[in-house]
């Protein structure tokens, strides 16, 4: 580890790494010295992120994957375990935003997709990578949440309910592992950020009024470098 490469020698896995906050975080982690496993569905988009990582002098491995496919996460964990003895950092940035609509008009398929991505996949990730995270000297998990998970808003019930479950999974896991290992779990609300998901939710909003994903990524790297206590939560404004 050096001052300009504080995460040198560490391995990180980022879901939702093909765009937005996930892509920015993956790039920032690599620039800080970590080898980053990039997980998302779109190969071309992952390759573009990998190119940016190479431009900043970092290294990465592409892992194209649909987190909602049966056994996909278990296969990924097996592949990672076959190459690395530990996983130092798990950043869960993947999320699915269903159409904003009154609760009575939620489309079942949309809601199911949100549940599978935001809830079921999260539990599967924590379970599958638990052994590798515990083997790390100081394993860390960061989950990116949303304020609608604990502050219900009209038309946001489909997404908000899945983020509430997301938070519960992470908080519970964090309490469980804190008693038995140095592994720590944090939940971070990135706040209003210039992403495609934000543009879908607020189509009339001026994107220039929002902070870029890189600001969120910078804070996450800072948090991972400095370390954090069990149960850490914060919002990035």
Which sequence ranges carry the predicted segments?
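Conserved glycine-rich cofactor-binding loop
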Residues: 11, 18-19
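Rossmann-fold scaffold of SDR-type NAD(P)-dependent oxidoreductases
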Residues: 15, 87-95, 118, 143, ...
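Conserved glycine-rich Rossmann-like NAD(P)H-binding loop of the short-chain dehydrogenase/reductase
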Residues: 32-48
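Conserved mid-core segment of classical short-chain dehydrogenase/reductases
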Residues: 74, 95-112, 155
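Amphipathic alpha-helical dimer-interface segment in Rossmann-like NAD(P)H-dependent oxidoreductases
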Residues: 78-82, 117-137, 175
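Catalytic loop of short-chain dehydrogenase/reductase
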Residues: 96, 134-179, 192
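Catalytic Tyr-X3-Lys loop
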Residues: 104-123, 142, 166
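C-terminal helical subdomain
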Residues: 183, 187-188, 195, 203-237
